[in-house]
Each structure stands twice: as C-alpha cells, then as structure tokens.
Amino acid sequence: MFRLEVENATGAALVLTGKEAQYQVINIEGLNPAPAQINTTPIANLDGALFNSSRLDVKNIVITIRINGDVERNRLRLYDYFPTKERVTIYYSNDTRDVFIEGYVENLECDLFNISELAQISVLCPDPYFQSIDELVTDISNTIALFHFPFAIDYDDPVPISEYEISRITNVYNEGSSETGVIIDILAKSDFSSITIQNVQTGDGLTLDYAFLTNDEIIINTNKGHKSVFLIRSGRSTNIFTAVRRDSVFFQLKAGDNLFGYVVNGDLQNEDVNIRFTRRTIYRGV
C-alpha cells in the first residue's frame, strides 16, 4: 500500500489515495532513480572514452488519475492543487519509506470527452532526490545521563543526576546512499570573532569572521542550491554570507560517518557555543 498527497504553494494539501469515490491513482511514473548523464571524451586510437563527469537529470514525475464522482468539480479541484508552472510538494509513503519531493507542474491534461475521465499530471523536479520526512539532529555537545533506578541521595554526599560532555569531535551520520547538505545551528554563549566548523576526515572547513555577541544564533545551510548564512540577533535575521572566509567549503555529508569538530577564536578549548547539525536522508528512488 502507498499514500500520495500533494501540497501547493499556498500550503493547501490534497490526499489522492483512499478516496476512490473522487480520485483513483492509476499510475505514478518517476518513482525510480532519475536517469544519469555521463560525460566522456573519445581518445584517439583507443577503445572507449575518458570519463569526465556525471550528473542526474531532472526527475519527471507523471501521475495518472481517474476522476470519479462529480467529475467537473473534482477536475477543477485538481487545477487548484496542480497549477501549471507553480511549485508543488509531493508526499509519498509506502511500507519502507516516507518521503517528499518538490517540483513544478509542467502540464495537466484531462480527457474531457471520455466517459471515464483521466487526468495526467507532469511535475518536473529540479532536485531529483526524494527527502525523508523526518529530520535527524546531532548536537556537538552531549549530555551524559547519570540517573538510574533505584537510587538514594545522601544529603551530605550529593551525586550528579547528569553532566555535560564537551565533545571536540562529533559523528554526523548520513543514513542514505547519497551525499546531502546539512543545516548547522550555532548558539553563542559569549562574544567571539571567529568560528571554524571542520570535517576532520577531509580537512574541509567553514570559517566565519564576524563580531558575534552572546545569545547570537548563526544558521548555516550547506544544501546545494540553498547555501546561506544567517545571523539572528534580538529577533532580527541578517544575511552574513560575506562573513564566510574565502577558502571555506560548504561541505556535504557523505554516506556513513562524518566527523566534525570546531574551533572558536583559534582556541580548541573554547566551549562558548552550542552546535546542532540537522539533516534529512535523501534517496534516488522509493
């Protein structure tokens, strides 16, 4: 069994499955991985070619729906939820995955003069990956729980219920099989002028040089097509992309383990920030 839902740019959502009295989903194309484009260069007097690069093409999702019940009214509803040229979000779930993908409605064709009216909807997705509904969160400083049952506390000899562990290296695990970006949320607990987040496996680092103040929040997005750096201070959001040091890398999370550390004002022992990594698992197909 599967569930299909669409959400238009205004946030209005329509569930298309389990409503056979109105809509019956006949077929969905594009749930498999998008085709790849392989770029090669022929080599004179040699068999084959030299590999240059590869990329995934735009994903084309085509949904075929039989319109039942009040056909006129239900067809017009589809026009509202699948407006051509506009952005839509398609939610799909089955027994193993619960994902969404964003795209733009290329076409919506209906056979108006057929007794059993069908609608065929084509959605082009510039980002060809499905994303998990659930976000995964990893903090770079963790709390160690020390509270166990049964227990007793001596008034003259108290014991800690929990304590903070300041981790210089944290594993941000990518459960998927494809690279993905990450959103890094930094909360300043004191003033500082420089912070570097570094992938200790690759050596890639992202450094911000700025006069940060206590209680500032810095949000870094490394997702392709959405790269940004914003500062939230006293409730006001400011674009501080110019604070990114020139040699910085907006790193991607490879499949599996990704080890990160940080340095504040060049001091490895500085503990005056809380850092959180938020990401989604991405899939080529469902």
Question: Where are these predicted regions, by residue range?
Answer:
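Short amphipathic beta-strand/extended segments with alternating polar/hydrophobic composition
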Residues: A13-Q22, V99-E106, G205-F212, I240-R245
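"Short basic amphipathic alpha-helical interaction patches in structured regions
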Residues: I63, N74-F82, L118-Q120, E135-I140
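Intrinsically disordered, low-complexity segments enriched in serine, threonine, and glycine
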Residues: T138-V286
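Oligomerization/assembly interface segments of phage tail-like spikes and tubes
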Residues: L46-G69, I115-P128, N258
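Hydrophobic residues positioned within well-ordered beta-strands of beta-sheet architectures
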Residues: I61-I63, I101, A119-I121, V182, ...
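Short beta-strand and beta-hairpin "edge-sheet" elements
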Residues: Y91-I133
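Polar/acidic, low-complexity leader/linker segments enriched in S/T/G and N/D
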Residues: M1-T40
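Short, acidic/charged, Gly/Pro-enriched secondary-structure junctions
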Residues: R66-L108, L259-G261
